[in-house]
């Protein structure tokens, strides 16, 4: 999933792959709340093995997480020119811990997305078409969405390297 940072520092889930229900689609997440909100407030990746029991997050979104059937969640900030642009999420529908390999892959994918966004912004700027402010709440463009698809593809390839059978099936 990808959440776009809005002008009031809320995250809105704007892109998703693999959700089983509409519970998280277009969900608005307050700064500091849940996994994504914590990522925004700390500017750091957060990994949760059991969302509804995690002590490091608030639990405003437990019902939506339960409705979707997610257990483990990793969220990583997407930062361009020192500004958070969004949050990249990966969640698993079974009670398995996402290991360091998965967290590292999500973080590397977020870094790749950051580079793509920075290049796109530079190209728009050089063409005189730069839109002021990254926090406009706009939907991702085709190139940005393609990067999210590429991330999904990388995670699927990572599945082959995961030894835990339950986690491999979930990924």
Task: Explain the meaning of each model-derived region.
Residues 4-6, 13-60, 66, 71:
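Regulatory sensory and allosteric helical modules in signal-transduction proteins
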Residues 86-87:
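Short glycine-/small-residue motifs
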Residues 118-171:
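Signal-transducing coiled-coil/dimerization helices and immediately adjacent hinge/linker segments
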Residues 72-79:
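A short, aliphatic-rich beta-strand micro-motif
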Residues 1-13, 120, 165-168:
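Helix-loop-beta substructure at the N-terminus of cytosolic sensory domains
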Residues 41-45, 105-123:
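Signal-transmission/dimerization alpha-helices at domain junctions
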Residues 91-106, 116:
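Regulatory loop-to-helix N-cap segments in sensory/regulatory domains
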């Amino acid at each position: 999933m990808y959440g776009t940072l809005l002008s009031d520092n809320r995250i809105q889930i704007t892109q998703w792959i693999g959700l089983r229900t509409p519970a998280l689609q277009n969900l608005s997440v307050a700064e500091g709340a849940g996994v994504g909100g914590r990522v925004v407030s700390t500017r750091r990746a957060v990994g949760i093995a059991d969302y509804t029991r995690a002590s490091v997050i608030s639990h405003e979104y437990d019902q939506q997480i339960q409705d979707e059937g997610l257990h483990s969640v990793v969220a990583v900030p997407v930062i361009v020119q020192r500004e958070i642009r969004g949050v990249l999420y990966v969640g698993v529908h079974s009670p398995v811990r996402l290991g360091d390999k998965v967290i590292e892959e999500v973080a590397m994918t977020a870094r790749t997305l950051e580079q793509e966004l920075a290049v796109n912004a530079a190209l728009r700027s050089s063409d005189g078409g730069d839109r002021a402010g990254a926090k406009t709440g706009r939907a991702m463009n085709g190139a940005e969405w393609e990067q999210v698809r590429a991330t999904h593809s990388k995670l699927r390839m990572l599945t082959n390297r995961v030894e835990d059978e339950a986690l491999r099936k979930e990924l």
